[in-house]
């Protein structure tokens, strides 16, 4: 792999780790439940992107498949949490 790609991936991983720390802070300190859910959504998206950058760095497809699973589970949990906040129940 070219040196520019390696450095780009390392910079991206560093920025994603920083974004994950900020999202974790928002999730822990959010004054409302909506802020905590937003922090959780941001955290799973950043985790998914971190796995994709690991996949690029190692040229291993397992990371891409894991990122896809995280995306599907994160989307379903976001919908369930939003429905719970609006109606107070998830299953009707």
UniProtKB/Swiss-Prot annotation:
It is a multi-pass membrane protein. Keywords: Antiport, Cell membrane, Hydrogen ion transport, Ion transport, Membrane, Potassium, Potassium transport, Transmembrane, Transmembrane helix, Transport. The chain crosses the membrane at residues 4-24, 36-56, 62-82. It holds the Pfam family MrpF_PhaF. Its main location: membrane. Disulfide bonds: none annotated. GO terms for cellular component: plasma membrane. It is found in: Cell membrane. GO terms for biological process: potassium ion transport. Belongs to the CPA3 antiporters (TC 2.A.63) subunit F family. May form a hetero-oligomeric complex that consists of six subunits: PhaAB, PhaC, PhaD, PhaE, PhaF and PhaG. This is Probable K(+)/H(+) antiporter subunit F. It comes from Rhizobium meliloti (strain 1021). The gene is phaF.
